[in-house]
Amino acid sequence: MIKNDQELNVTLDRVRQFQLQVANLRHVERNPANYRLSASGYLAELDRMTLEIREYLWSHPTETPSEAVA
């Protein structure tokens, strides 16, 4: 769970790195099945981080993310 803006920025950087890694895999992996196997872990982690970012951004700075759940 992202707790502050510094953690948000770190997570945003990680998202960008993972996106670049998957984009690179698309160009270097010639076998579609191998590509999917290689990319699936990155994509799952991207989904998890994106959800964390969304939950953090949904909360107002005066409340904790768990208070903002609607």
What are these language model-derived features?
Residues T11, V15-R26, M49, I53-Y56:
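Non-transmembrane amphipathic alpha-helical segments
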Residues M1, H27-S38:
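Short, Lys/Glu-rich amphipathic helical modules
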Residues H60-A70:
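Long amphipathic alpha-helical coiled-coil segments
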Residues M1-D13:
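Short, charge/polar-rich alpha-helical segments
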Residues A33-T62:
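Short, charge-rich amphipathic interface segments used for partner binding and complex assembly
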